[in-house]
Amino acid sequence: MRFAAIADVHGNHLALEAVLADIRAQGVTEIVDLGDMASGPLDARKSLDRLMALDAVHVRGNHDRWLIDRPFEKMGAWERPAYPQLDAGHLDWLRTIPATAVYRDKVFLCHATPEDDNVYWLESVAPDGAITCAPLDEIEKLAAGISQSLILCGHTHTARAVRLSDGRLIVNPGSVGSPGYSYNVPHPHVVQAGSPDARYAILELTPAGWSVSFRHVPYDNSAMAELARANGDNEFASALATGWIR
């Protein structure tokens, strides 16, 4: 069993195309998508058209949910540029995407955590903004009741693998389309990948257990940085250009 996991495309269709090409080059034919597909100051329509055409298993992210359950005037800074690009078909499709899924009986999929699509699972944020791996006992509490040996999540745009004490593995593949952002919950903090590459992971079930290969894929990130800047989001543009926002 071998497949690719993508997450957090955020409307970056050039990064998505580069990742899909790399997946094909690796001989992988199966894909799961962990959500946050379209929101951002980029090209929501092209990204969602491409994802809708994929033979993939999708779960919905918090930004996907906000596109379909909030009136426009209450949408956030990443939804407002994306929403006008989408038509009824895109939004209806997003409504069909579940919050969680099980892939081939062996893999549990969610965007952030099994119960909440907008909290961090594998990371903790200190009052001073420092980000560290969350304590194992806190991670394991949120994994209670999940029987699958592999658990996949996204949301934090941070590639990471955590082995639980019972042998299960939780993996975040990193973000395809957004290598950095700032956020104020639970405390003001900044996530920065340090390079502008598109990220995803290849998972393989071997006789010894799950193998994880984190992939960093270069693409025309400068073009997407220019688009973000043209759409008025200098922070997103900086992340796309360099992998850093400050």
What function would you assign to each model-found segment?
Residues 133-164, 168-173, 183:
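Anionic-ligand binding region
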Residues 163-246:
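Acidic, His/Gly-rich catalytic cores of divalent-metal-dependent hydrolytic chemistry
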Residues 47-109, 115-147:
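Active-site neighborhood of divalent metal-dependent phosphoester bond hydrolases
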Residues 6-7, 31-36, 40, 57-62, ...:
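Active-site neighborhood of phospho(di)ester-bond hydrolases with catalytic His/Asp-centered motifs
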Residues 10-15, 39-42, 64-69, 102, ...:
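Active-site environment of divalent metal-dependent phosphoester hydrolases
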Residues 1-4, 102-109, 164-168, 208-210:
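Beta-strand-turn-beta hairpins that frame and shape the catalytic cleft
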Residues 23-28, 103, 144-147, 202, ...:
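Glycine-rich phosphate-binding loop signature in dinucleotide/nucleotide-binding domains
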Residues 1-56:
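N-terminal active-site segment of His-dependent metallophosphoesterases
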